[in-house]
């Protein structure tokens, strides 16, 4: 792999590294404090979760879901009211909220997939509808969540008695195990390719990449070990990302989303039910928006009528910044993870240095514009635009 190809392939990873170093310097190292690195995950958990669902929508042809922020508000409002005013066990409350999220997705998926209402219009209507319902349920008030079981399911930390004291060694041990598994998986994958006679990249470059990833994992888990340990919220985020990475890269159904975005007419002629693809994309998106609503409600400890405002923009921005094409048909879960982290680092870095909130919007808008321009220019060069 020559330098030009390397830079093109890892543009956003390089950008993430540069931005992280820049803010580490501008904040005089405060960005690297264990608490700030832990908050980086907690404050962007909802973005990572929703971005996985948004990716499926974007893959179908650059479509988006504008209603997810309002879905977060509606689901959070119902969870808060059920926990505050009924004797339902938190697990039942969670199941009710996730079921409601699926119903919302089925509602939107039907209109988009079967009736062929443009996704932008349908989800714009949903944005107003679900926001209004959420505010009506809350009665224009802020409802607090004090149920410890609910909070522990989403917003607690993993601590092992007898092992974790001032330093949460379990967090660093998890980092070591993950790093070892990545190395073992790399050896296994290369051995399988060699056995089948497949062409593969140079061993030095592949193991250098794994070494960098492992170093980052060990650094991050070491920092977590010196704060409160691994947040339970991280388990939810990792689970969602792994599931969607598997669906989009290892299953035939996952490839249908790419096919629809690449050429919908050809996909339909090949026998694939494109209506079902749209239906599943928006049902999946609403389910993850509902989960994000529960995560956000637990982290903040309360819900109000403005909960979830602009969340859809963060999810959409993460996808485009992470390499998802504005035309659809391309994008990966690892890419959107990089995009979400990059956006999170920018947000947290600007907050730490005390940049005015108005200028924070300017910076985020500029970053998104640059990412989309890069995508459009790249597609024109390869003849994919239009």
Where are these regions (language model features)?
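Alpha-helical transmembrane segments within multi-pass membrane transporters and channels
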Residues: 87-128, 338, 343
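Membrane-helix/interface signature in polytopic inner-membrane proteins
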Residues: 186-200, 242-282
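Transmembrane alpha-helical segments in multi-pass inner-membrane proteins
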Residues: 282-295, 299-362
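Cytosolic-side transmembrane-helix boundaries in multi-pass membrane proteins
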Residues: 1-21, 142, 179-211, 273-276, ...
């Amino acid at each position: 792999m020559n330098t030009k190809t390397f830079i093109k392939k890892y543009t956003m990873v390089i950008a993430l590294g540069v931005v992280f170093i820049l803010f580490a310097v501008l904040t005089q190292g405060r960005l690297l404090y264990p608490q700030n690195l832990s908050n980086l995950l907690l404050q962007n958990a909802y973005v990572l979760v929703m971005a996985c669902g948004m990716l499926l929508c974007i893959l179908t042809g650059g479509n988006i879901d504008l209603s997810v922020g309002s879905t977060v508000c509606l689901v959070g409002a119902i969870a808060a009211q059920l926990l505050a005013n009924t004797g339902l066990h938190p697990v039942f409350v969670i199941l009710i909220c996730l079921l409601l999220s699926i119903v919302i997705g089925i509602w939107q998926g039907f209109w988009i997939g079967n009736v062929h209402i443009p996704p932008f219009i349908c989800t714009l209507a949903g944005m107003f509808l679900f926001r209004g319902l959420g505010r009506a349920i809350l009665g224009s008030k802020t409802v607090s969540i004090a149920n410890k079981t609910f909070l522990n399911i989403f917003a607690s930390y993993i601590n092992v008695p007898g092992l974790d004291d001032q330093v949460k060694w379990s967090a660093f041990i998890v980092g070591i195990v993950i790093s070892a598994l990545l190395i073992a998986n790399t050896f296994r994958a290369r051995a399988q390719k060699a056995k089948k006679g497949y062409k593969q990249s140079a061993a030095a470059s592949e193991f250098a990449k794994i070494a960098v990833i492992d170093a980052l994992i060990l650094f991050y888990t070491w920092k977590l070990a010196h704060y409160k340990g691994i947040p339970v919220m991280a388990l939810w985020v990792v689970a969602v990302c792994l599931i969607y990475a598997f669906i989009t890269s290892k299953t035939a159904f996952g490839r249908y989303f790419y096919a629809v975005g690449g050429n919908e007419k050809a996909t339909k002629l090949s026998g694939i039910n494109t209506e079902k693809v749209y239906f599943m994309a928006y049902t999946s998106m609403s389910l993850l928006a509902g989960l994000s609503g529960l995560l956000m409600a637990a982290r903040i400890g309360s819900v109000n009528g403005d909960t979830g405002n602009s969340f859809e923009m963060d999810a959409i921005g993460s996808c485009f910044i992470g390499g998802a094409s504005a035309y659809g048909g391309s994008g990966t879960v690892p890419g959107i993870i990089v995009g979400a982290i990059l956006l999170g680092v920018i947000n947290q870095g600007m907050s730490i240095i005390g940049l005015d909130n108005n200028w924070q919007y300017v910076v985020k808008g500029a970053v998104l514009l640059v990412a989309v321009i890069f995508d459009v220019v790249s597609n024109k060069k390869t003849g994919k635009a239009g």
